[in-house]
Design a protein with these regions (language model features):
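Single conserved hydrophobic/aromatic residue that forms the stacking wall/gate
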Residues: 1-12
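Short Gly/Pro-enriched turn/cap motifs at secondary-structure boundaries
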Residues: 2, 51, 173-174
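Conserved strand-loop elements at the edges of beta-sheets that form or border functional pockets
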Residues: 5, 54, 64, 76, ...
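Hydrophobic face of amphipathic alpha-helices that form TPR/SEL1-like repeat modules
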Residues: 13-66
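Residue-level signature of catalytic and energy-coupling elements of molecular machines
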Residues: 49, 68, 104, 149, ...
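Glycine-rich loop-to-alpha-helix module at the N-terminal edge of alpha/beta enzyme cores
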Residues: 69-159, 169
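Conserved small-residue-rich beta-alpha loop and adjacent elements
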Residues: 162-208
Length: 208
């Protein structure tokens, strides 16, 4: 992989449109990955299965740390957006919390399959957004993301309740139950992997 900072030559910055079409960014050579630019021009908040405008109507620039290129605009959210997301999660939990373990496991496996199918694209997006080497995204971050989804898809199948005899007239039993709606703040170290660390086990356990 090749990286060029904001100090790249003017000649490189004025590369032809044909050359630009072979790469997703002037800072990153991804021609060998055969992927298109992974971002749309603007993103709202993903709530209840679709992108929606932020309540404030405001957006901010998402800039790649590789060379300070703007890669897209992102919703500037506030507490009203959080409330909307919480409402959607509580509504989804009514059904998801009652979904049987086999179904939850199969859905997690499908998520892993989709991630694996789009590994090159997601690794490119992670690299541009995060600034880390594309080879690290390709060889470490994304494979670990996929593996975590499959791991928890398997683990949940082995989760069972238990009964313990305390005395000849007393028994103790436990039944795993989802907590409900949970939240997560994702730092910038490796966003997709850190999100997966929390999302996969939470969804596997029936939380939203």
């Amino acid at each position: 992989p090749q990286f060029r900072s904001s100090a790249a030559s003017d000649v490189y910055k004025r590369q032809t449109q044909q050359s630009k079409n072979s790469n997703v960014s002037s800072a990153l050579d991804t021609s060998h990955l055969k992927v298109k630019f992974p971002f749309k021009a603007k993103y709202g908040n993903f709530i209840n299965g679709k992108f929606v405008e932020p309540k404030s109507g405001k957006y901010f620039d998402n800039v790649s740390p590789i060379n300070n290129e703007k890669i897209c605009s992102v919703a500037r959210s506030n507490e009203k957006d959080v409330e909307a997301a919480l409402d959607a999660a509580h509504a989804a939990f009514v059904e998801w919390g009652k979904t049987d373990i086999t179904t939850r496991s199969n859905i997690l496996y499908k998520i892993a399959d989709v991630l694996e199918k789009n590994l090159n694209l997601l690794a490119t997006a992670e690299c541009l957004d995060n600034g880390k080497p594309i080879r690290e995204c390709m060889a470490a971050d994304l494979p670990l993301v996929i593996d975590h989804w499959r791991y928890f898809a398997g683990v949940i199948r082995a989760e069972e309740g238990s009964v313990a005899e305390i005395s000849n007239s007393q028994y103790s039993y436990n039944i795993p139950e989802p907590l409900g709606v949970v939240g997560q703040i994702v730092p910038w170290n490796f966003p997709l992997l850190m999100a997966t660390w929390k999302l996969a086990p939470a969804l596997a356990a029936g939380n939203c």
